């Protein structure tokens, strides 16, 4: 019984992961969710701005909590692979595609890996300062 329950759980989890990779038809066109390496509002703005200029992309919305961008597009004008490649050219990972290093190097500091994990250095005050 326990093995069956475990098997069913793995199958459902695998199905959900696979479903995220497949385009879903919506009223405006097709929709796909792409995992990114975005970490802040500037990342969100950069990705959504750049995707707005990709031919065939109708809309995009990046959820920073999950680091997933949902893109609605016209399949006659673009495809998921082209959209992923566009994201990598901005400097971010897109599903299994690695970001372009030159683009990453030009990102603001807050958009780079570990930028939000680094504590702000404290400068010691000299005697008599700060009062």
Residue map of PLM features:
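Short glycine-/aliphatic-rich beta-strand segments at the starts of folded cytosolic domains
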Residues: 26-38
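Conserved redox-active cysteine motifs that mediate thiol-disulfide chemistry
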Residues: 38-46
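Mid-chain, structured segments of secreted extracytoplasmic proteins
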Residues: 59-105
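Short acidic amphipathic segments
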Residues: 47-63
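Short acidic DE-rich linear segments
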Residues: 21-23, 127-131
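Processing junctions and N-termini across compartments
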Residues: 11-13, 34-37, 104-105
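Bacterial Sec-dependent N-terminal signal peptides
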Residues: 1-26
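Short, low-order "capping/linker" segments at domain edges
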Residues: 104-128
